[in-house]
Amino acid sequence: MDATPNGKDAFVVTAANAAGDPLNWAAAAEALSGSHLDEVKRMVAEYRKPAVRLGGQTLTIAQVAATAAHDQGLKVELAESARACVKAISDWVMESMDKGTDSYGITTGFGATSHRRTKQGGALQKELIRFLNAGIFGNGTESNCTLPHTATRAAMLVRVNTLLQGYSGIRFEILEAITKLLNNNITPCLPLRGTITASGDLVPLSYIAGLLTGRPNSKAVGPSGEILNAKEAFELANIGSEFFELQPKEGLALVNGTAVGSGLASIVLFEANILAVLSEVISAIFAEVMQGKPEFTDHLTHKLKHHPGQIEAAAIMEHILDGSSYIKAAKKLHEIDPLQKPKQDRYALRTSPQWLGPQIEVIRFSTKSIEREINSVNDNPLISVSRNKALHGGNFQGTPIGVSMDNTRLAIASIGKLMFAQFSDLVNDYYNNGLPSNLTASRNPSLDYGFKGAEIAMASYCSELQYLANPVTSHVQSAEQHNQDVNSLGLISSRKTNEALEILKLMSSTFLVALCQAIDLRHLEENLKNTVKNVVSQVAKRTLTTGVNGELHPSRFCEKALLKVVEREYTFAYIDDPCSGTYPLMQKLRQVLVDYALANGENEKNLNTSIFQKIASFEEELKTLLPKEVEGARLAYENDQCAIPNKIKDCRSYPLYKFVREELGTSLLTGEKVISPGEECDKVFSAMCQGKIIDPLLECLGEWNGAPLPIC
């Protein structure tokens, strides 16, 4: 309901109640229609708009995230149509006070002491702000106990939006003042801890009220990071020279809401939605470099499971893999000796849609829950003008925040667990289908341990992430003289989810660098294998085709079998010393010649037709030529003069690779270079924190029509 200027209440006509949906279930379900990817695209578009217009009911998490991050260049505007409504409720409070009406927080004490009474409404609000200023900032210590700048801006925006609906009893001028602080990039200092998000986020929100009322302990941070007192903040924001003298109910209206928890939750969920899509694309790239079998994305499999998150995750991966040069090449490899190879891929690859789907559903549902919360009226009491009464309820209870954030954090931890499993397979030469151990790229693997340190770091990240997955909401303590005996812990859960999100970014960054390393190693592998095949072919033709007198020799029939050895053998299993007798290449090439010799029968007794006699000359010439040609191929690779181009350029995953390699300036890591894995991962992490990964990520899916491929 919205209060109207003439003091009447009017139901807001929405799609929900117009369609006979008094319980709001249909509206909640409708909000989840369409694909998750389309929703993420809409979020990104909203995030990039230059202005946020507040009216009380249409605020989105993307707008909250944008306001939090864009402290310059983004303008917050208040709907002028809300002014009369807000004023009507404010006037009602003053009139009821004059009439002697007994209302909670207006004429009574607070919480467990609401049995106390007073007629000094303004003084009561002033005392409310004073006793709620119970936070600790730890000034001058190494511990930073101040709420992050972004979270405070988010809280300010959300609180203004909820108060605009006109049920709380506050002057429109106070909302304008908060908006001016936002638009002039002046951020009150709020304590990091001290709220249980039960009667709202009382303690942190009291510091916004403290700044507005000019409390001497209130501080703000200015546009250049300077510390401001209340007077300086007002002057810089062009609010005026006079602080607000709170009228009855206004202090309670400012502090008795869930804006800090839901504001931070909005920031978290905006990024969580993007990282969820990234995890889908990363899983597809993982399948490419691991030479996976793409049938794990077949729509029939997922259609039969019914879960929309799983179906969409599989369809996105299917889209990335459809037409992939890696998948085409892998198919040919799988056709070689198929009975000697695993029939299906390991779980981290094959069940990635089933694993990610529920996490995406949880994140998406949490997004809608928080979006409802930031558009809700969530203080107490609420004023119903038409009924001429203050309604005493509990909308300040931030349970939707605590539950949504606990669930989101568990989903984030599950995404991280999958990434770690995939990363572990990628760096393990027992499982990665021919890539070198630890993704080493040097000529001498004994002096290059590649991503070994990165895998240890990933284990650390994953362990901390799993710990953070534990629920916050199960640790409720009875508070405020047992009045707040159940409380949501919404902000605490939001903070912990924000920590989890940071760790998932660390994991995503590290994994992306490793995947780009694997892509480059596949490119190097292809060129090295091609070089080895050419050399083996040349040497075979020169040494095995003819006998000593120029006649055709029986060993000439060995060439095709020799080339099959090169095709079958993992290149990195021998390439650091290709002619070593302890490595498989030379052993298996010799075995081919020996097998042909054994089948040569009586011809072996004749020196002119003996294949055994050819083995020494074949190996001697190979040992002379092969190391030089392999080094030449490596040099050509290092100088971007490869005979075979990189397959990634023909894949839908190329935009992400291009972003990491070209825009961020990362390169193939080797023990021969000074640069460390952490330096490259840092570049990706920083770019991710700045939102730069969004465009290349969405470009990978630019051609997807929102549907799986037809079942053939």
Swiss-Prot record:
Compartments it resides in: Cytoplasm
EC number: 4.3.1.24
SUPFAM superfamilies: L-aspartase-like (SSF48557)
Catalytic residues (positions): Y104
Pathway annotation from the record: Phenylpropanoid metabolism; trans-cinnamate biosynthesis; trans-cinnamate from L-phenylalanine: step 1/1
Superkingdom of this protein's organism: Eukaryota
Reactions that this protein is recorded to catalyse: L-phenylalanine = (E)-cinnamate + NH4(+)
Enzyme class, first EC level, given as a word: lyase
PTM text: Contains an active site 4-methylidene-imidazol-5-one (MIO), which is formed autocatalytically by cyclization and dehydration of residues Ala-Ser-Gly.
GO biological process terms, semicolon-separated: cinnamic acid biosynthetic process; L-phenylalanine catabolic process
Modified-residue entries (2,3-didehydroalanine (Ser)), positions: S199
Covalent link 5-imidazolinone (Ala-Gly), residues: A198-G200
InterPro entries recorded: Aromatic_Lyase, Fumarase/histidase_N, L-Aspartase-like, Phe/His_NH3-lyase_AS, Phe_NH3-lyase, Phe_NH3-lyase_shielding_dom_sf
Binding residues annotated for (E)-cinnamate, in chain numbering: N256, Q344, R350, N380, K452, E480, N483
Keywords tagged on the record: Cytoplasm, Lyase, Phenylalanine catabolism, Phenylpropanoid metabolism
Disulphide bridges: none
GO CC annotations on file: cytoplasm
Family membership: Belongs to the PAL/histidase family.
Alphabetized PANTHER family for the sequence: HISTIDINE AMMONIA-LYASE (PTHR10362)
Role description: This is a key enzyme of plant metabolism catalyzing the first reaction in the biosynthesis from L-phenylalanine of a wide variety of natural products based on the phenylpropane skeleton.
Protein name, UniProt field: Phenylalanine ammonia-lyase class 2
Organism of this sequence: Phaseolus vulgaris (Kidney bean)
